[in-house]
Amino acid sequence: METDLNSQDRKDLDKFIKFFALKTVQVIVQARLGEKICTRSSSSPTGSDWFNLAIKDIPEITHEAKKALAGQLPAVGRSMCVEISLKTSEGDSMELEIWCLEMNEKCDKEIKVSYTVYNRLSLLLKSLLAITRVTPAYRLSRKQGHEYVILYRIYFGEVQLSGLGEGFQTVRVGTVGTPVGTITLSCAYRINLAFMSTRQFERTPPIMGIIIDHFVDRPYPSSSPMHPCNYRTAGEDTGVIYPSVEDSQEVCTTSFSTSPPSQLMVPGKEGGVPLAPNQPVHGTHADQERLATCTPSDGTHCAATPSSSEDTETVSNSSEGRASPHDVLETIFVRKVGAFVNKPINQVTLTSLDIPFAMFAPKNLELEDTDPMVNPPDSPETESPLQGSLHSDGSSGGSSGNTHDDFVMIDFKPAFSKDDILPMDLGTFYREFQNPPQLSSLSIDIGAQSMAEDLDSLPEKNVREFDAFVETLQ
């Protein structure tokens, strides 16, 4: 389309649309991970905080989105779609919603690219953050587990709404006008979710040992199978080497589940085979091979490095405490298994792994239990004067008893209470406080008639004083 944009504005607009598409995929997929996402705001944003939003990217989602884009951008007649589907443990699948980012031919040539388009795209992304959490798929994603998982797929082309069933609804997130067209972000979602209940109760147990899902078709026969991936938090440095688009022969389909964060990823497969560089890295194999990734072409040493400090957690700690530094290295780690995986859980010890920067580590590991800065020595117990006065009667009678068995009795004396009403509980005190007694000064009943009689009798009682006062005035 012929436009009056200069080269710099055209370059900026393409960059804005590209990163908006990537952030759109991140927001949609992260909203289906099944956990709430809390991100702190920063007073000094970095260059990676596009559209004034601190959205931490998950590397695997970014890789799949870039592979789907393949160097092209959403334009007129070229829509980017994110399909969210559900798959049960029995092999049944159901499409839940389809998010579509498209552009039409309606242009706004007077709009400024540098600030106006950028700020409106930021508002559209904020609207997407809110709307992704009000559709029915969000409620299902919060409850996913071993019974079903949520999958996503990114593709370019015509929107495929036939899988949503009858009576699906659509919602428009918003539109942003640009000099080359109007960007539109919309969603079509399923409202008939009776699939889970009907199939769950209609299926009868087999009489013989028949595999129930043997003849169940794949959800997408023309594409590669969807492999459930272990949950990874946003911004986590997984250390996975993602292959390029040319190296991967799979269509842009992947999946994820909301298993708890993996406690340790076992390096290699069952036999410890390192990951080949030309294999696509995602799914359960990526979880098993996340640590040991090496390239035979370069001569670097292949060391097993953990993906993040938050992903590793000690599973077996003896009840007797840590005995020696050798026991720390012998600590057993267990791999977290994803849904539908029947492989045995292998155990690996850190003694078989190479420790990075081992030459800089001290030879004798000093445990935290023996560190005086972490665990200071216990100070001698000093008996306070108040405690001594409270226990003076009991300690004098039986000094041989255990001091920890004594109980300190403190009298409850609420404010503004009288000693004669004790003992009393808190409820009684509250009722007494709500209905206080009347002041004694208000209880004296002085009538108006008696006051008038007293005033009339004053001159008669003090006649001499009044006469003396009148004489002084003359």
Swiss-Prot record:
Compartments reported by the entry: Cytoplasm, Cytosol; Preautophagosomal structure
UniProt-annotated stretches for the region Important for interaction with ATG101: 127-134
N-acetylmethionine modifications at: 1
Location of region: Disordered: 295-324, 368-402
Bias kind Polar residues: ranges: 305-321
Subunit structure: Part of a complex consisting of ATG13, ULK1 and RB1CC1. Interacts with ATG101. Interacts with ULK1 (via C-terminus). Interacts with ULK2 (via C-terminus). Interacts (via the LIR motif) with GABARAP, GABARAPL, GABARAPL2. Interacts (via the LIR motif) with MAP1LC3A, MAP1LC3B and MAP1LC3C. Interacts with TAB2 and TAB3. Interacts with C9orf72.
Name the record gives this protein: Autophagy-related protein 13
Native source organism of the sequence: Pan troglodytes (Chimpanzee)
